[in-house]
């Protein structure tokens, strides 16, 4: 139900206008990372969470776009129920799972939810979180973009793990999980895998740090940005394929580019 109150319309128009300035019509899929602290403080005083999330997403859905949002649960054991297990991430991540026409991928650690005409892209994925037949791989060549709303680029970019797996980063290793995956009570399988940090190298925790890569990225023409990541007021759009290629190139130039500390294997 759309509330015709002024606060909702104001927020809706705020985001719609920003999206238009970012040329969202060049894209069909929007992979969204979000932190609403700044935006909510300015726009959501009298809005419910539902109304605010609608104001963010509806302008895209009404342009026939598909939005994809991480709904990670990190279910490393026991049962992951695709249709029920809540996400351990933030506001938009929880909100999207409550929507009537949502589709959700099946990975017990790293699932994604989608709304819009292409939402089924996230369904029936392979068992690898970031690798073959994953949401990340499927978005390649699909007129996709990554949209950071109130989140600096260097703080969130799971796409780098897809790149690390693609390029054979030696500081990560593939790990399988015995979590049993169900959807609406139907058993789908187990042994879903993720390419995770190694824990066996003394003096290295392999924490990822995207500061250096982000600085280089801003020197390219890839990010289009309105607002300022320093106070979380940014809306930043990056072409998904161009961003992926940039990360691949960065990795081959420097195998430690995504790490907080240099690692020589």
Regions found by a protein language model. Name each.
Residues 1-265:
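N-terminal and secondary-structure boundary signal
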């Amino acid at each position: 139900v759309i509330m015709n109150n002024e606060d909702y319309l104001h927020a809706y128009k705020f985001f719609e206008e920003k999206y238009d300035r970012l040329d969202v019509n060049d894209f069909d899929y929007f992979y969204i990372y979000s932190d609403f602290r700044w935006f909510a403080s300015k726009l959501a005083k009298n809005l419910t969470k539902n109304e605010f999330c609608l104001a963010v997403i509806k302008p895209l859905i009404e342009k026939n776009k598909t939005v994809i949002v991480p709904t990670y649960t990190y279910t490393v054991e026991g049962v992951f129920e695709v249709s029920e297990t809540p996400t351990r991430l933030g506001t938009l991540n929880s909100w999207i799972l409550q929507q009537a026409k949502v589709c959700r991928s099946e990975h017990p650690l790293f699932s994604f939810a989608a709304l819009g005409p292409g939402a089924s892209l996230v369904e029936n994925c392979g068992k690898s979180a970031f690798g073959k037949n994953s949401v990340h791989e499927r978005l390649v060549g699909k007129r996709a973009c990554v949209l950071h709303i109130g989140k600096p680029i260097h703080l969130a970019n799971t796409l780098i793990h897809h790149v690390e797996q693609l390029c054979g980063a030696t500081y990560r290793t593939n790990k399988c999980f015995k979590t049993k995956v169900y959807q609406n009570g139907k058993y789908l399988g187990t042994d879903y895998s993720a390419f995770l940090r190694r824990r066996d190298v003394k003096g290295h925790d392999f924490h990822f740090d995207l500061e250096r890569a982000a600085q280089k990225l801003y020197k390219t023409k890839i990010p289009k940005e309105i607002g300022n990541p320093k106070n979380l007021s940014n809306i930043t759009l990056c072409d998904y394929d161009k961003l992926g290629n940039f990360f691949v190139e960065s990795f081959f130039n420097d195998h430690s580019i995504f790490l907080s500390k240099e690692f020589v294997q």
